[in-house]
Amino acid sequence: MVKLAIDMMGGDNAPDIVLEAVQKAVEDFKNLEIMLFGDEKKYNLNHERIEFRHCSEKIEMEDEPVRAIKRKKDSSMVKMAEAVKSGEADGCVSAGNTGALMSVGLFIVGRIKGVARPALVVTLPTIDGKGFVFLDVGANADAKPEHLLQYAQLGDIYAQKIRGIDNPKISLLNIGTEPAKGNSLTKKSFELLNQDHSLNFVGNIEAKTLMDGDTDVVVTDGYTGNMVLKNLEGTAKSIGKMLKDTIMSSTKNKLAGAILKKDLAEFAKKMDYSEYGGSVLLGLEGTVVKAHGSSNAKAFYSAIRQAKIAGEQNIVQTMKETVGESNE
């Protein structure tokens, strides 16, 4: 049985989409128990595997992260993290304030001994539909080569345990594919990755080929990773808008759009990384999953499923035994 703590109040569309996703999750997964934290006035579920705990406070999207977790000790997000810290829950899921969630992850759930910097990881779409693991996308703006090596080790475990990929191919994001390309960070990181024979490091990868499906894990610093992620999000939205405008521009195009409706929907689904779940803060003593702030019920359900798989695969213990112990 996997037990997850969930923030009912976090996100733009909470609590409605959270409640809908939780209800579907406990119906679909018979080995799942939920601890739900939020306002009792807005709780309306009744299921034997859902335990509700009232919280009198909520961390808002605009709250300053560290100050919020210190001042709002009875908030749904803080109480959720405390449940993971105490061992009551195997992991947690929230669509709330990203900075606050990273703060409760670091200061309440806690970092695995030997992990220098936790990393925020997402799974992004590829042309062939299989996707790739991408980290760090914003946990740490600055990074050292040793941190990128550790990100690769964490990403390797994540790709194996969560995505079911044997011997995943690992690449370093750079401005060229040649080993000598890049700045001091990427050059030294390349050396370290190449020397770690426990990893299937296949070299550098350029941003323009990220979605080609040639690799399984891509490693970069949080500053670069966050910009790449937001660029991909923006590009996908722009392409969608351009397609819509083109289809609506004439009767002929509208007819073509009606014929291609199913194919266009499939394309949109393939480009939507929320299909793969939320982003995960790797390197902590428990699984911490961040669903997108504007998640609908389907996306939040995917984040719950992702956290459940992490619990089933005992990913935290694997990270302790490999990355943690090797760096103590």
Swiss-Prot record:
Subcellular location: Cytoplasm
Pathway(s) where this gene product acts: Lipid metabolism; phospholipid metabolism
Annotated GO biological process: fatty acid biosynthetic process; phospholipid biosynthetic process
Gene Ontology CC: cytoplasm
Protein name: Phosphate acyltransferase
Similarity comment text for this entry: Belongs to the PlsX family.
Entry EC no(s): 2.3.1.274
Function: Catalyzes the reversible formation of acyl-phosphate (acyl-PO(4)) from acyl-[acyl-carrier-protein] (acyl-ACP). This enzyme utilizes acyl-ACP as fatty acyl donor, but not acyl-CoA.
The gene coding this protein: plsX
InterPro entries, alphabetized: FA_synthesis, Phospholipid_synth_PlsX-like
Annotated keywords: Cytoplasm, Lipid biosynthesis, Lipid metabolism, Phospholipid biosynthesis, Phospholipid metabolism, Transferase
Subunit and partners: Homodimer. Probably interacts with PlsY.
Catalysed reaction equations from the record: a fatty acyl-[ACP] + phosphate = an acyl phosphate + holo-[ACP]
Molecular-function GO terms, alphabetical: phosphate:acyl-[acyl carrier protein] acyltransferase activity
Main location: cytoplasm
Organism: Staphylococcus aureus (strain JH9)
